[in-house]
């Protein structure tokens, strides 16, 4: 989704779906998708800690690659960053996996 990456979905008896969702900016919390398509956040496990941090700016962009295939990229900048900044360029191979708008317990902390 635009808000992050949903995973571990489980159907509930009332027809709703319980799932976890995270993004580059925050680790997992639990959500409920009701039968009408409304999403409700159920937990905010790290809200207090995240409120102490300056959020990053997350931008998704793309360009035409080999054979005119769409290649996606992401830019993350510290809060308030302006002008030229140092760059960390991470190339991820595939097709077994890809980067997306998700929290990495390996890289984000």
Predicted regions located by residue number:
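Serine-hydrolase catalytic core recognition
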Residues: 6-109
């Amino acid at each position: 989704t635009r808000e992050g990456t949903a995973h571990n979905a489980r159907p509930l008896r009332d027809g709703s779906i319980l799932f976890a969702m995270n993004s580059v900016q925050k680790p997992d919390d639990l959500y409920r998708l009701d039968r009408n398509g409304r999403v409700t956040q159920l937990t905010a496990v790290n809200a207090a800690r995240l409120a102490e941090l300056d959020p990053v700016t997350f931008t998704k962009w793309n360009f035409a690659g080999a054979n005119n295939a769409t290649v996606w990229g992401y830019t993350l900048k510290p809060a308030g960053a302006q002008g030229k900044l140092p760059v960390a360029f991470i190339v991820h191979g595939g097709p077994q996996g890809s980067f997306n708008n998700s929290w990495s317990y390996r890289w984000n902390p």
